[in-house]
Curated annotation (Swiss-Prot):
Protein family: Belongs to the universal ribosomal protein uL5 family.
Superkingdom, natural source: Bacteria
GO biological process assignments: translation
Native species: Vibrio campbellii (strain ATCC BAA-1116)
Keywords of the record: Ribonucleoprotein, Ribosomal protein, RNA-binding, rRNA-binding, tRNA-binding
Name recorded for this polypeptide: Large ribosomal subunit protein uL5
Assembly information from the UniProt record: Part of the 50S ribosomal subunit; part of the 5S rRNA/L5/L18/L25 subcomplex. Contacts the 5S rRNA and the P site tRNA. Forms a bridge to the 30S subunit in the 70S ribosome.
GO molecular function, one term: structural constituent of ribosome
Higher taxonomy: Bacteria, Pseudomonadati, Pseudomonadota, Gammaproteobacteria, Vibrionales
Role summary: This is one of the proteins that bind and probably mediate the attachment of the 5S RNA into the large ribosomal subunit, where it forms part of the central protuberance. In the 70S ribosome it contacts protein S13 of the 30S subunit (bridge B1b), connecting the 2 subunits; this bridge is implicated in subunit movement. Contacts the P site tRNA; the 5S rRNA and some of its associated proteins might help stabilize positioning of ribosome-bound tRNAs.
Any one cellular-component term (Gene Ontology): ribonucleoprotein complex
Database matches in Gene3D superfamilies: 3.30.1440.10
Length: 179
């Protein structure tokens, strides 16, 4: 079991129950899933780019990504409905906890000029979204084998009802919020 999951069960639940005075343990917010998304707009011209992006995503997440397709045609972007334009992965359970641990302790500190992530990126329902400009911050990615530096979106979905509860949950995991 991931260390972060043990820490959640042993410390975070008690801490948040006291802070928000919950009456039941089931009211305590928990992380439900982490979604990684990588848009590869250049894949219209070169299918190899999407394959490489999917391989990077699989290496980062530990599971095979789903290829996302365009929902509708947009002439300005030169895409048609059904064109493969990106990939995404939804992490739950053990893989989710392991990814979160790697993100907080290894990947984010490797970002150049890192001063913390914005505490304002909550959606109003306790879910947190952030972007990473380079996939090479993850230690699994071999810098020499990368064909192109790509970014990805990371969404942490929680069961929290408000942004305040979601922020408290992530802060309990020592999530590096900007001061």
């Amino acid at each position: 079991m991931a260390k972060l999951h043990d820490y959640y069960k042993s410390s975070v639940v008690a801490e948040l129950t006291k802070q928000f005075s919950y009456t039941s343990v089931m009211q305590v917010p928990r992380i439900e899933k982490i979604t990684l998304n990588m848009g590869v707009g250049e894949a219209i011209n070169d299918k190899k780019l999407l394959e490489n992006a999917a391989a990077d995503m699989a290496t980062i997440s530990g599971q095979k990504p789903l290829i996302t397709k365009a929902r509708k045609s947009v002439a300005g972007f030169k895409i048609r409905e059904g064109y493969p334009i990106g990939c995404k992965v939804t992490l739950r359970g053990e893989r989710m906890w392991e990814f979160l641990e790697r993100l907080i302790s290894i990947a984010l500190p490797r970002v150049r000029d890192f001063r913390g992530v914005s505490a304002k990126s909550f959606d109003g329902r306790g879910n947190y979204s952030m972007g990473v400009r380079e996939q090479i911050i993850f230690p699994e990615i071999d810098f020499d084998k990368v064909d192109r530096v790509r970014g990805l979106d990371i969404t942490i979905t929680t069961s929290a009802g408000t942004d305040e509860e979601g922020r408290a949950l992530l802060a309990a995991f020592n999530f590096p919020f900007r001061k």
